[in-house]
């Protein structure tokens, strides 16, 4: 692997001082085909020498690969310094895949329902280390990869520049060739970076992990609430929605904690006038501290949400890969 793997064609052309056409050919070889740099066709040796001189060799090694009974596949990958991250291949409609990528090794946010938070933060990933995760998965897949979600280990907006660089590489027509509208970047609510993201006008889908509309409840679940409280977060979401349209809000449902009528009412008040898509998902008991709602509790909460958020899409997310710790909130770099 090469550190320049994280560059899209335009960035590579600028950094290496080469033509955009040569950069596209190199990107097409290294990222589009997953081939060695020297396999790039119709590129002069002097240009390849220049690019190779700028590149620092790097490594991303597969440690383990486990298959869940529902078709999810979890990849445990080791970086050159020994740090480990995970990527998950998600089957869609028996025809294609979405890939969940990590932006950091571990996570500093310490959300109570997330196994990654219990690891602490080892370090942020470089752009090429993010892109290389997708290349590992793609090399192992017979179906096309048509979507990417930055919902693996880490907080993407605490590694903002590398995540955006990787995302643009993944949607480069010469590189990852993934429609930018099918790339989702999720944040636990780093308000200044949400505002920066909105101001910069990026084309990727923004998802915000909300999980409670009552401040003291959210604070107990997500320590980030201390630094970036709900009112500031919702203001940033409102600004983004005004410019880009509907924002996806993720909501981890925890039995007896955030699924009552008062929680639905608080959501209705908090999100009034903001076009959102609410994605509830049952908590996965990775930490042993929480349990998911049963069907009766979910049905009651769904009905309450429909009353409090009339006209807003409420789409329950499927939680796949649980038996192999590939599901949302379960990534902990375990080998089994």
Swiss-Prot record:
Top EC class, one word: transferase
Residues of the Radical SAM core domain: 93-322
Cofactor note: Binds 1 [4Fe-4S] cluster. The cluster is coordinated with 3 cysteines and an exchangeable S-adenosyl-L-methionine.
Active site: residue positions: 86, 328
MF GO annotations: 4 iron, 4 sulfur cluster binding; metal ion binding; RNA methyltransferase activity
Principal location: cytoplasm
Superkingdom of the source species: Bacteria
Binding site for S-adenosyl-L-methionine: 154-155, 186, 209-211
Required cofactor names: [4Fe-4S] cluster
Binding residues annotated for [4Fe-4S] cluster, in chain numbering: 107, 111, 114
Enzyme Commission numbers on file: 2.1.1.-
InterPro entries the record matches: Aldolase_TIM (IPR013785), Methyltransferase_A (IPR040072), rRNA_lsu_MTrfase_RlmN/Cfr (IPR004383), rSAM (IPR007197)
Keyword Transferase: yes
Transmembrane segments: none
Location in the cell: Cytoplasm
Cellular component GO terms held in the UniProt record: cytoplasm
Keywords tagged on the record: 4Fe-4S, Cytoplasm, Disulfide bond, Iron, Iron-sulfur, Metal-binding, Methyltransferase, S-adenosyl-L-methionine, Transferase
GO biological process, any: tRNA methylation
Disulfide pattern: 100-328
PANTHER family: 23S RRNA METHYLTRANSFERASE, RADICAL SAM CORE DOMAIN-CONTAINING PROTEIN
Family: Belongs to the radical SAM superfamily. RlmN family.
Cited NCBIfam families: PRK14470.1
Protein name: Probable RNA methyltransferase Anae109_4379
Lineage: Bacteria, Pseudomonadati, Myxococcota, Myxococcia, Myxococcales
